[in-house]
Every structure is written in C-alpha cells, then in structure tokens.
Amino acid sequence: MARNEFVFLIDVDNTLIDNDRVAVDLKRHLTQEVGGRRQRRYWELFEELRQQLGYADYLGALQRYRVENPRDSHVLTVSSFLINYPFANRLFPGSLDAIEHVRQWGPAVILSDGDAVFQPRKIERSGLFEAVEGNILIYIHKEEELADVQRRYPAKHYVLVDDKPRILDAIKRVWGPRVTTVFPRQGHYALDPVAVAKYPPADVTIARIGDLVAHDAKTLKAAARPTRG
C-alpha cells in the first residue's frame, strides 16, 4: 500500500458530534419514559459499564437496565430513541467543513472508540461515513491499536484531532514528531481544567473543530513537537 504524505485521524464524540447534547436529550427522554429514579439507575449502569469497557456503551447499559427491569415495556421506546436519534443535528458547526478542508492533503479517517453497533450507526446517521468516504476505524482502546492504524493508513505524517488530552498524550508518546496533536476545546473532557492539567499541552489547540480550516498541512506538520515523557 502506498504511503500517504498526510493522514488526518479525527475522533467523533465531542470532536465532531456534540455528544454532551446527545446525553442531555437521552436523560430527558429516559425521565419522561421511566421516571427520575430509573433514569438515574440507567446512568449508574452506564458508568459501571464504561469503567469496565473503557468506552461509552449506551445500548449495553440499556441491556443491563433491561435485565434489572425485565417487564419494563419502555425499554423498546428508549432503544428506538437511540437507534433513530438525529445525529446529523448534533454535528458541531464546521465539522463537515473541517473534514473537507483537510482532505486536500490526505485521507480523513474517523478514529474512534466504541461498541460494534451503536457507534457505527451514529457515524452513518450523522453523515460522517459519507464525509470521510467510509474511512472508519472503531476500536476498544484506539491508543493501543496504533500499529493497525499505520498498517491500514500508512503516512509520513499524521494529524490527530481529539477532545481528550489523555488520548492525545498517549499517542504522542508513541509517535512523537510523526504526529501533530490537535486539541479542540469542546465537550466536558476538554473543559475540565483538572483533567487538562494532567497532561502536556497539545501541539495545536483550537477553540472548536471548525477552526481547523484556518490551518494547512504544512503548518500543522511544523507544529509537531518531539516525544514527551
């Protein structure tokens, strides 16, 4: 496989899609369907599962809720709400423009963590699948799969866009100056000063994903710092 000059690896949740808004909508729907107490129990199960898996699994948490409440007919309604959610309405402003912009210099690839059902559904319904021409990678722990990323999308230089400082730092430690890390300050991870302070700053920080259009490949590559830690 020919090696690209650049490959742009872009996260989904709170990078391209406002997942915090999705969670707010789900909480509201759960409260309407099952009441406040059971809504809170769903999120307890959700957090337990996230700790176990390392990623958010909305349908998995709903299945656990169903085991605890086998005769709750509202489970099907909540499942339908998730599967048919209008994710395209939750794209951050400028998300698709940012993808189109970077594709001038190389493939744009979705690099995400998640389950094997809901995450692909989210990517498809949001229009992101089409925007990146089907270049989708979904892992359990993406920072542990860099060899596979390189095999599938070989490049002289990578640009990684992610709202989680932990992920940016972990991948920077492996790839060093071969990757430019870009930190869009969107979502609860990016806006948590304690969480952000735990890690070195990204090579490039932008206020929102749409601001990526102000950067070209040459300047992004020049911004890459050496390996940290």
Placement of each model-derived feature along the sequence:
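Short, acidic loop-to-helix structural element flanking the phosphoryl-transfer center
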Residues: 59-60, 64, 80-110, 143-148
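Conserved SAM-binding loop
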Residues: 16, 108, 160
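Short hydrophobic segments within beta-strands
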Residues: 11-12, 111, 161, 184
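Substrate-recognition/cap helix-loop segment adjacent to the acidic, metal-dependent catalytic center
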Residues: 96-109, 113-137
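Active-site neighborhood of HAD-like aspartate-dependent phosphohydrolases
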Residues: 1-44, 67-68
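Asp-based, Mg2+/Mn2+-dependent phosphohydrolase catalytic module
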Residues: 1-5, 124-160, 164-229
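Conserved Rossmann-like nucleotide-cofactor binding loop
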Residues: 15, 22, 116-117, 166, ...
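A metal-dependent, Asp-based hydrolase signature
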Residues: 22, 33-37, 46-83, 101
